[in-house]
Amino acid sequence: DKAESRGLGDVYKRQIKKEGRPPLRELNNFMVSQLKNTISGVHILPFNPYSSDDGFSVIDYTAVNPELGSWDDITALGNEFSVMADLVINHCSRESLWFKNYEKNKAPGRGYFINGLEFEDLSQVVRPRSTPLLTEIHAVDGVKQVWCTFGEDQVDLNYRNPDVLLEIVRIIRQYVEQGIHFFRLDAIAFLWKESGTSCVHLPQTHELIKLLRLVIENLDPSAVIITETNVPNRENLSYFGNDNEAHLIYNFSLPPLLLYSILSGDCKHLKTWMTSMPPARSGRAYLNFIASHDGIGLRPAEGLLSPRELDGLIENIRESGGEISMRRTPQGDLTPYEANISLYSAMERPIDGEVDDFQMARFICAHTIMLALEGLPAIYIHSLLGTENNREGMVHSGRARTINRYHWEADDLYAALDDDGRHHKAVFAEMKRLIQIRIAQDAFHPNATQYTLHFSDQIFAFWRESLDRKQSLFALHNVSSERQTIPLVELNLIATEAWVDLISGFAYEDLAGQIVLEPYECVWITNKG
């Protein structure tokens, strides 16, 4: 239905705060007052008690961090929006009861974690971080080397132990009872470990996802599962399974490719990638995004951008105040893993260019493209607001990802959104306007037909058609800083129908004329205005 096309807002639980009010309650207030008729779902990043990584090192899965609010606040938000919660089930905190009991060799916790000393060959393990894979602990039953994919405070769970799986099932049941509708399986690709393998995307991991889907759909047949697998494109697509794994998969190649296209003024790689993407079958879809609480993943661009092009993008990000996080390869080398930068700040200058007047135009162009693509859009709250780099917070925390995790004081935010002299007001208004245009179009259903159109490499264009074939929509986007012209005859518009650009409202009456696109201008031309 139309609600499917509205998309998700991606938000940290503390990103809007007001003294004397729990952050989750203030978030609800902002969402209802500002986005009720624009966004249909909200992804609240981990809201449990945690020890590190901004929530992704969970101490207690069954509780809401009292500093943030309560389960009542989560339920209240769920009464207005579809709520997505993270299942951070690859690992949990060293401060959790489970891990403390593991060290004591008592239940619950005995056998819940992985002792790397029991694995003969770890030479092929794929790492998303540069930290050591194993961390030594002194437990009551001897010295162990616990497996830590993401860092020493985040200890991987042992799914060879069925008690671990039963714990996760109980947690899922509680979340469903509290009104959670979307389940994001965080870092799920690393779930199963096997000696002598990469320990990523293993067949056992896919079997566990199938099992979790059966459990979740048994509890709530309308629930939706999203897999978070920040990996090269082919591996990412495998998480659809045979209609028995994820309902939604993140389109991880989109952020680096779209950013490169906008900053280079050349979309040939974006077009090549899109023509290779199979359409998602009915009942499943791509989750399109270009910014999130994490950085912009660079691994999904491997094989799509050349090393020289990737180096150019990385240099541009650094010039715009961003950072590059590294991972360690099985050979021990450090290689770029993700770009840490606010998306608005990333649009500051073109590659090999200087700061210019097109920052907002580039930013809006990128989101206009994302909103038009096959799939469901997910928009990070700092993209809705046009938040810039939080370098002060990054330096204070010592974590690169903090650069894109700014915490707005509610009064400051509302003042910024009401100030004609600040870009936040214009960004927020235009983003909401584009989303509301999208909502009304049958051709933007997540599974509506999509075909790539081939004009110059400065124009990223595609055609969408509604499931009932009544609405045709041509989405054309100038990704360059130069004016572009396209003869209307190249679109093969049906002369007996009226064609209008939904974004500007301009009616195309002379089909022998031309479309003129100013720098970073976009048009959505349709026969159903």
Pin down the residues of each PLM region.
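Active-site and adjacent substrate-binding regions of carbohydrate-active enzymes
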Residues: 1, 5-529
